[in-house]
């Protein structure tokens, strides 16, 4: 005759709970990912002004504007000099100015951003585009419309 030993109910419940916790701990883990539809922003408006050798961009954002991190200003001089582009050619930026948070030429106030890009030729016309990067690397950069900035 064999003797069966019955486990007490609390002990078997504890074993079952331990097995359940052990199995759930083996799952795939990853960092939370941003939801693009909720975390994106866009340029609502971008106004361009010129002051001597500077381009001043007054921008307004919509959407989740708090996620704006870095702003790049893409510039292409338009003219007849070597290396200049033309107004009807495809946009080919010749220089990119990067404004990280806290940079000297970048000012943020709620959903408004002011960028001042200097050291430009005050006699030249420039094609300008603003590109905003999110704090979440998984979200694509957001580019503004292409604008033309003529000297005063």
Annotate each PLM feature.
Residues 28-40:
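Proline/serine/threonine-rich low-complexity linkers at boundaries of modular beta-sandwich domains
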Residues 22-25:
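C-terminal motif of bacterial Sec signal peptides marking the signal peptidase cleavage site
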Residues 53-57:
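Structural beta-strand segments of beta-rich domains
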Residues 70-121:
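Recognizes extended acidic, P/S/T-rich segments that occur
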Residues 61-66, 134:
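Extracellular acidic, Ser/Thr/Pro-rich low-complexity tracts
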